Amino acid sequence: MTIVSPDKLPSARAVELTAPLDDIYQILNEDGAVIIKNFIPLELVDKINKEVDPYLAQHAAGPNHMSEIYKLTVGSKTKHMGNLTMASKSFRDEVLNHPSMHAISEKLFRANFGDYWLNRAAVLEVDSGEKAQGLHRDDSLYPWKAFLTKDSPELMVNFFIALTEFREENGATRLVLGSHKWEDSTRYPSPEQTIPAEMQAGDAIVYLASLFHGAGQNRSQKTRRGLSITTHPAHFTPMESHIDVPRAIIENMTPLAQKMIGWRTWSTNHGVPVWTVRDGRMEDELKLKSLESPKQIQAAVI
């Protein structure tokens, strides 16, 4: 096997938000990851940061439950803060309606599965002095990983938005480009095979759940903060439930955002309605109100 020197490893490819969807999808398929520049505007970055600051100040670092796999992957100086639908109006109004996020999710999931929804959204904050996270694949959290073959469709994608600069010295996410295509399920990468996903605030790294990755060591004096949004086919149970979101908040969301958090009936790729109430569509049976004309934060990808 040929060993590639770390200084000769290719960087993650980057495109503008206005790049054609087919170009984005091609890079995602070939490399397992693609950086989209200016995924959200800096004004939105600032609003999200201000909305989550008080919650993060109260949030403890380290694993927030006793799962063994989380003990191994969440460092003692890293905060994972969920509940963003209630904590951040900007998240539920703007990010959950992001046209590029939906265009990519549609491209990945629609033909094989039908509708998709949110698996989990969380702010990940890596503090100064945090060690590098162990390399992992997000889809290894789920039992169905054992039944996948090299020809299986992708089952989850992560849209990781930089809320601060991502630099190698402050713990930028490290990627093993191409590892989503490895046929040997026992193969595990070394740190020397990783490259940092360096980004400006507002950029996003989009990567497949089958790609090896992990947060880098934060050698700087500042925290590194990002917003992770994973989507997957609605056939799968999300990691985070939104059953406790007050109806007053739900009814001030768009139909698309409502469906993303499990408050609407979804359909399979054959048009079969799922997640129904009293044999009817959830939104009809609950007489659910919604905002029908969302403010789009960017033009949809072509």
Swiss-Prot record:
Disruption phenotype: Abolishes the production of 15-deoxyoxalicine B and accumulates decaturin C and 5-deoxyoxalicine A. Keywords: Dioxygenase, Iron, Metal-binding, Oxidoreductase, Peroxisome. InterPro entries: Phytyl_CoA_dOase-like. Its EC number is 1.14.11.-. It comes from the Eukaryota. GO terms for molecular function: dioxygenase activity; metal ion binding. Coiled coil: none annotated. Fe cation binds at H136, D138, H213. GO terms for biological process: terpenoid biosynthetic process. Its cofactor is Fe cation. Belongs to the PhyH family. The 15-deoxyoxalicine B cluster is a rare cluster that contains its own geranylgeranyl pyrophosphate synthase (olcC), in contrast to other related clusters which rely on a FPP/GGPP synthase localized outside of the cluster. This is Dioxygenase olcK. It comes from Penicillium canescens. The gene is olcK.
